[in-house]
């Protein structure tokens, strides 16, 4: 792991075997994995995934924010932690954490702890959007209706001159090209397979590429040092991350490639810090809060997919 310690994965004596689902560790929603397969998948996510790409930048605050606690027991949550793959449950109400539960040792707690770095998955899309809100509020980007016509790499692709809101809504019309996810870097894909591409109907299509383009576009707009400063301002000074939050590159050939993904890594408490910052912006009607309300108002039908 990142701190130099290691966990030796061993199958239980009664193991019925591990299904690796192709070796990636990702299990689709329609599968019914056994307990050993779930543990193996978690092991991959905790100990392999954080190291699978070059890191762009990491941030933690010198004076992290703290939480107030007024804990109560919840029998249903405890039961779910004992019988399902649920790893962690935090409930924040009226300015306090009122439920704080984690997987027990005899389930996944020998691997997963309060300091484990969770892979953001789809939450990374929300965090990316939150950063876009800050970019709009500091004037780096004009608005959600700004057209992506100032980045030469997008020329002669379906993304050129589209409004930013289309990519935020994952409705850029790229469904013909993104049915399967790719580990190839954004810059490489735009310069090769997307040259001459044409957009289809601007309807919702859940994929990673739109968001990876947005993070890499932020890197183009700010520059390397400028985007790292934005991370310092948002995660360090505003949210006041305690442990660490970092963003990896995606498909980079070397550590100098200027191509980003949207997969963040943070602890369970630091994800709550991020969520609380979003809630505070919304409730206080800050500039970023107004941005959040705008994209909520401009959301599009998802045909029952992804909520």
Regions inferred by a protein language model and the residue ranges of each:
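N-terminal leader/targeting segments and the immediately adjacent pre-domain N-terminus
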Residues: 1-111, 138-142
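Active-site-proximal loop and beta-strand segments within enzyme catalytic domains
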Residues: 67, 77-79, 110-115, 119, ...
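Solvent-exposed, acidic/flexible segments
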Residues: 70, 74, 84-85, 116-124, ...
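Glycine- and aromatic-rich loop/turn segments at beta-sheet edges
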Residues: 101-111, 183-200, 240-257, 303-304
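Penicillin-binding protein/beta-lactamase superfamily catalytic region
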Residues: 198, 202-204, 229, 247-307
């Amino acid at each position: 792991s990142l701190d130099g310690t290691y966990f030796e994965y061993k199958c239980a004596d009664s193991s019925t075997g591990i299904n690796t689902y192709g070796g990636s560790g990702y299990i689709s929603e329609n599968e019914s994995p056994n307990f050993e397969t779930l543990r193996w998948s978690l092991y991959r996510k905790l100990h392999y995934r954080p190291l699978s790409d070059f890191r762009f930048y990491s941030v933690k605050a010198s004076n992290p924010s703290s939480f107030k606690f007024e804990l109560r027991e919840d029998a249903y949550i405890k039961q779910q932690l004992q019988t399902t793959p649920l790893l962690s449950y935090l409930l924040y109400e009226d300015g306090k954490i009122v439920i704080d539960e984690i997987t027990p040792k005899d389930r996944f707690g020998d691997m997963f702890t309060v300091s484990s770095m969770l892979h953001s998955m789809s939450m990374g899309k929300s965090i990316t959007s939150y950063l876009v809100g800050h970019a709009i509020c500091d004037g780096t980007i004009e608005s959600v209706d700004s057209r992506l016509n100032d980045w030469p790499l997008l020329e002669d692709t379906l993304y050129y001159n589209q409004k930013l809101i289309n990519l935020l809504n994952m409705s850029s019309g790229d469904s013909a090209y993104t049915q399967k996810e790719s580990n190839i870097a954004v810059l490489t894909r735009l310069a090769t397979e997307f040259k001459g591409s044409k957009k289809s109907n601007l309807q919702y299509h859940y994929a990673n590429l739109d968001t990876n383009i947005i993070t890499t576009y932020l890197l183009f707009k700010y520059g390397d040092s400028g985007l790292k400063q934005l991370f310092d301002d948002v995660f360090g000074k505003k949210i006041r991350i305690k442990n660490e939050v970092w963003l990896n590159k995606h498909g980079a050939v070397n550590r100098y490639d200027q191509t980003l993904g949207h997969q963040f890594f943070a602890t369970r408490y630091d994800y709550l810090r991020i969520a609380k910052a979003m809630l505070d912006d919304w409730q206080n009607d800050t500039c970023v809060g107004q941005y959040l309300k705008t994209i909520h108002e401009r959301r599009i039908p998802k045909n029952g997919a992804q909520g």
